[in-house]
Amino acid sequence: MSFVAGVIRRLDETVVNRIAAGEVIQRPANAIKEMIENCLDAKSTSIQVIVKEGGLKLIQIQDNGTGIRKEDLDIVCERFTTSKLQSFEDLASISTYGFRGEALASISHVAHVTITTKTADGKCAYRASYSDGKLKAPPKPCAGNQGTQITVEDLFYNIATRRKALKNPSEEYGKILEVVGRYSVHNAGISFSVKKQGETVADVRTLPNASTVDNIRSIFGNAVSRELIEIGCEDKTLAFKMNGYISNANYSVKKCIFLLFINHRLVESTSLRKAIETVYAAYLPKNTHPFLYLSLEISPQNVDVNVHPTKHEVHFLHEESILERVQQHIESKLLGSNSSRMYFTQTLLPGLAGPSGEMVKSTTSLTSSSTSGSSDKVYAHQMVRTDSREQKLDAFLQPLSKPLSSQPQAIVTEDKTDISSGRARQQDEEMLELPAPAEVAAKNQSLEGDTTKGTSEMSEKRGPTSSNPRKRHREDSDVEMVEDDSRKEMTAACTPRRRIINLTSVLSLQEEINEQGHEVLREMLHNHSFVGCVNPQWALAQHQTKLYLLNTTKLSEELFYQILIYDFANFGVLRLSEPAPLFDLAMLALDSPESGWTEEDGPKEGLAEYIVEFLKKKAEMLADYFSLEIDEEGNLIGLPLLIDNYVPPLEGLPIFILRLATEVNWDEEKECFESLSKECAMFYSIRKQYISEESTLSGQQSEVPGSIPNSWKWTVEHIVYKALRSHILPPKHFTEDGNILQLANLPDLYKVFERC
């Protein structure tokens, strides 16, 4: 038998590239991982993934990142082409995900790749197709959004053995969901979505404003999210920092869920997982495991990222010392959280006057059983199919209103100083012009009959932005100026500096609101999903599995009352475009049947003169505490700004002026502020008599599909009910007086219809 030496031949370049591609791209999930990392390197804030047949037939990933320059499209799919690395020494300080320039090249050698991309300075997008790393044809201009869309078709079409090994699309799709879910947890603040082609509902979806815990809840369920412990430690000697979330002793699953990111790379570490599970062995039942999400940031020069083709392994210095430090920190956190067990109770809402549905904590719980992840299966009749945090495009499409005045109204910025008083007084920097009194009068005269007219609507244009919107500088004996970070979003309290009120009467009114508040109702309003308006007085909202009918009039009235009390003396001003004579407004009110005027009360002119003189005496207090401004001639020139972008129905202005003079208790301080705030809240509330329901005439909708909805409906949904989420503590009597009614409950509907 003769031994003949074999001939060494140089492999064909296509064979070499295909072998290398098989190492880097082992399955569809690896391809998606590489492309997601490219999206993150491109500073994307939204990443959408669409797959077909587990990614073997189609993978489409789209981002809104920086895009790819047209000049780079020729070589973008060639091996060892990258924008993130220039020299080997750069690996010591690499901070991006990609560095070898192999991902797209490897994919193009085992699939058909099409790239559509547009940069910020590009006039249009460009589309190019690739095969074996080469451009098939010159890039073609096309329409497209900012960012990049990569389409991968027929993955492993030229590797028959690999395609046969990956014959289970469901398994591959599950691994894709796992990869995207893990990246979405680590990259809170970036929106991720994954769905099958042709499906309308995404299987993984995170919101751009969601926190890490929110994303864990969305991906792994409520059972783990409510049992999390936040961890974090830093060791400058070892040059590392760690943060993350781990489950406490209440939670356990049959298989360990371990999310490990080292310098923001999704990696695996068997030694670290075993070290942590050793700690949990003392707390969890046998054969059960914890949930772990850890993010380690180690000095880049101490990490070697170039040790595996798929980059799922890294090596780093001082590994044993770092593992020991992490193990000690987790053990200390678990030791401090093992003194209690948590149970949850649920009651009907809003059946009781007192708070319910609260978490019950027991301190004698070392012997209680652990919560199992498998026991939290959500059945169809218990599934909540809405998310209160979702936003609608309608919120950004504010309907154009028909102004009462022929003159265009605008938001103007004023900066005044009171020189005569010897102290600078920067007042009402953000003002809103309102219609002239003549139009208000004409509008109200048309309201005297039975015909209901629409609310006064305004066309608003934003003027120059002030550096300190609605800031009011005052120096009084009973107030002081402080920085305030609370209640920032909607009310007049969102000022850089606000006045702290030391008036006992106001503090007492605030305390009464707190004592009468219903926490469960507040939670319901905070997390509700708005369904729609029945009419100006009633609206539908969903909370969890229940549908509620809400009295918009009463809720908005309570909302404005609480804003007036809590933000007392901290309001901006809605400036009228022309001064409104109080005499004319009072006469309009007395002419209205709603005033209840009779001849026995005396001549209307005399009563109107009395109202003008009376309110002029109170003008200084009204302007200081309520931003209700009356000039020396007896003209109304400003109203308080309670909620941004909200203007009260001016048809109610005459009655409001009349009731200020007749229904407010001006003798006692507390009663004065309370009654004045209630009258003002009534004027600002959504009232049916001041809104025209053209859309419900004869029971038919007048709105054309695709048209802008009625402005009052937009205001109710996107201004009033948005404010209800965070600026109201509903009183307990709302559970009994019919202002909040439960109409339906999903489990009860299932008993009747046996389906959803």
Swiss-Prot record:
It comes from the Eukaryota. Changing residue 215 to S: Risk factor for LYNCH2; no effect on MLH1 splicing. Changing residue 117 to R: In LYNCH2; decreased mismatch repair activity. Changing residue 67 to R: In LYNCH2; no effect on MLH1 splicing; decreased mismatch repair activity; loss of protein expression; loss of nuclear localization. Changing residue 635 to K: In gastric cancer; uncertain significance. Changing residue 29 to S: In LYNCH2; uncertain significance; acts functionally like the wild-type protein. Changing residue 320 to D: Risk factor for LYNCH2; no effect on MLH1 splicing. Changing residue 681 to T: In LYNCH2 and CRC; abrogates interaction with EXO1; no decrease in mismatch repair activity. Changing residue 234 to G: In LYNCH2; uncertain significance. Changing residue 69 to K: In LYNCH2; decreased mismatch repair activity. The keyword Nucleotide-binding applies. Changing residue 361 to Q: Abolishes acetylation. Residues 362-375 have a biased composition (Low complexity). One of its GO terms (molecular function) is ATP-dependent DNA damage sensor activity. Heterodimerizes with PMS2 to form MutL alpha, a component of the post-replicative DNA mismatch repair system (MMR). DNA repair is initiated by MutS alpha (MSH2-MSH6) or MutS beta (MSH2-MSH3) binding to a dsDNA mismatch, then MutL alpha is recruited to the heteroduplex. Assembly of the MutL-MutS-heteroduplex ternary complex in presence of RFC and PCNA is sufficient to activate endonuclease activity of PMS2. It introduces single-strand breaks near the mismatch and thus generates new entry points for the exonuclease EXO1 to degrade the strand containing the mismatch. It is linked to Lynch syndrome 2: A form of Lynch syndrome, an autosomal dominant disease associated with marked increase in cancer susceptibility. It is characterized by a familial predisposition to early-onset colorectal carcinoma (CRC) and extra-colonic tumors of the gastrointestinal, urological and female reproductive tracts. Lynch syndrome is reported to be the most common form of inherited colorectal cancer in the Western world. Clinically, it is often divided into two subgroups. This is DNA mismatch repair protein Mlh1. It comes from Homo sapiens. The lineage of its organism: Eukaryota, Metazoa, Chordata, Craniata, Vertebrata.
